[in-house]
């Protein structure tokens, strides 16, 4: 497979609404513009629950959040957004792994013979990623038993995922995350929506 890698720079992460600063055990960076958006300042956990942020009333100063946790969740979610963008542009793409890294994120992508992704294609992939972000798709999580998980990935043409699930115990339950039309086998966590 071809590895597509992106680097993400995160600067001074915080969640702030006026004089309210939000933080939690597994935080995510979001610039919250109004109180209605507060419900979206969360991370979607594999058990399907939102991990809420804790409000700290102070003088409006920015609270520091654990950089490594913020960065990991954003990068991990960005990898899923990139995979969805690639799948839209290259429907035959087959994905292996796509984790967050210390410098960004990547996804191993297998394409049919004669189809290649080069640096010249990156602007189109980035543009599609921006569309997905604008669509503000919700990350949802669901579980399936091993046999159903294999069937789902076979139906979607994901041979590497089928192979990986096939290596798991017969009684395994597999976690999937979905945003819009894209579904990936994943243990999470992720941001709640593609648009921060």
Q: What are the language-model segments listed below?
A:
Residues 1-12, 24, 28-40:
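Ser/Thr-rich, low-complexity intrinsically disordered segments
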Residues 28-31, 40-45, 49-50, 57:
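Short, positively charged and aromatic/hydrophobic N-terminal segments
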Residues 54-61, 101, 111-196:
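Non-catalytic interaction/regulatory segments
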Residues 59-99, 185-192:
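N-terminal catalytic cores of NTP/NDP-binding nucleotidyl/phosphoryl-transfer enzymes
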Residues 104:
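Short acidic-rich active-site patches of cyclic nucleotide enzymes
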């Amino acid at each position: 497979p071809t590895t597509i890698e992106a680097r993400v720079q995160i600067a001074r992460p915080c969640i702030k609404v006026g004089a309210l600063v939000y933080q939690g055990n597994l935080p995510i960076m979001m610039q919250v513009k109004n109180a209605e958006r507060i419900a979206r300042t969360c991370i979607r956990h594999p058990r399907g629950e939102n991990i809420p942020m804790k409000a700290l009333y102070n003088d409006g100063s920015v609270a520091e959040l654990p950089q490594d946790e913020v960065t990991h969740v954003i990068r991990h979610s960005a990898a899923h957004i990139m995979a969805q963008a690639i799948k839209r542009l290259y429907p035959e793409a087959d994905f292996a792994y796509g984790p967050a890294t210390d410098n960004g994120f990547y996804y191993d992508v297998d394409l049919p013979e004669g189809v290649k992704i080069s640096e010249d294609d990156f602007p189109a992939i980035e543009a599609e990623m921006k569309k997905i972000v604008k669509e503000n798709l919700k990350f949802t999580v669901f579980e399936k038993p091993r046999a159903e998980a294999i069937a789902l990935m076979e139906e979607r043409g994901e041979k590497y995922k089928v192979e990986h699930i096939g290596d798991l115990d017969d009684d395994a339950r597999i976690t999937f995350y979905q945003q819009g039309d894209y579904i990936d086998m994943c243990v999470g966590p992720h941001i709640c929506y593609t648009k921060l």
